[in-house]
Amino acid sequence: MNDKWTPSINLDLMDVINTQSIKGVQVGSPEAFIFEIMGEAELPATRLSKKSKIINHLYGNVNFLSENGYVIAINIDFHGNREKMITLGDIGSWGVNDWFELSELKGWSLNNLDGVMRILGGGIVIELSKEGELSMVSLR
């Protein structure tokens, strides 16, 4: 573990959305791929709770969750203060209408629940504020 962790890669979020993977690591990948492709994690891998079988691998604003040796989810946080391995790129200035257009283009559904907008597509969940500010992207 490094004293000051820095991401070994930086990717644009739209690349992650389009490929639903991070440098080839995707849901269903062997857990060993995480370290092979991403390098050293920011913190040691830890269980979500004492009795949980789910292990969290933290890489800046990205959490890889694994269970029984396989990746089961990838969460990308845009509200936290961690180093950004995944950046917003051009979509950083998007508003609600832009996200609506993307969801229509991809054939994804858009739901609004108590001021949180959620775009749901095959294996991806994108969460936005009612103003269209991106908070979380989850690959499942």
Feature locations, PLM:
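Short helix/turn-capping signatures at newly exposed starts of structured segments
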Residues: 1-140
